Amino acid sequence: YKEGKELYDLATSKGLRIWGAPAVVNSPQFAFMAEQINKGTLGNLACAHGHYGHEGPSWSAFFYEPLGGSMPDLGVYNIATLTGLLGPAKSVVAMTTIVTPERTVDDKGKIKVREEDNAMIIMEHEKGVLSHIECGFNYFDPYGHLGKGQEKATISLYGSHGNMHMVGYDWAPNGVDLSTMDHPVPQRFVPDTNGYVWQEGA
């Protein structure tokens, strides 16, 4: 508690916000990916990609007002996953836009969107590794906000000897697909979450 309070006080004194990182690093799929990186299964890592988006929350105007947005709502999961796997960012470049200037939400009806609903980040990590994250509230997804049944990869890593893809969202993973020079046909690993739920960090 004491260390957390000190961080909170420091952030407040500088006019900044602070929140706990999502618990995506607790999943067995994350652990498997980290193990493969540490073992050198992918060779020299070059790049990674994170993707998370849907058509936007309808239950609250908060997401479209100042201090809301897709990055703190969605992108933060991918940031936690990729910095957890690749280490901290040495440099960051980001761009945000508003794609849908008006929304209808349950608590306020029709509103003007005043915070980004479309964001992209590029991070530079150690050893020349680059990662890219895209998130937004304008992405049609047939699996919806909850992503149930999602079979596409939303986290991907590429190296000189192989590539690896987390299937499903990083907060609700369904497995990891791995391909290497030695085994080019993708193999699925860790299809079970073993009790992991994203709310562990809430």
Predicted regions and their residues:
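Rossmann-fold NAD(P)-binding glycine/threonine-rich loop
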Residues: 1-17
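Alpha-helical scaffolding segments of alpha/beta enzyme cores, especially the outer helices
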Residues: 6-9, 35, 84, 120
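Predominantly a Rossmann-like dinucleotide-binding segment in NAD(P)-dependent oxidoreductases
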Residues: 14-20, 24-114
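Hydrophobic beta-strand positions in blades of beta-propellers and related beta-sheet-rich domains
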Residues: 33, 176-178
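A sequence-level detector of short linear motifs
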Residues: 44, 132, 165-166, 184-188
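Contiguous beta-strand/loop segments that form the cofactor/metal-binding neighborhood of enzyme cores
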Residues: 80-175
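C-terminal helical cap and adjacent loop that interface with cofactors, partners, or active-site loops
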Residues: 155, 182-202
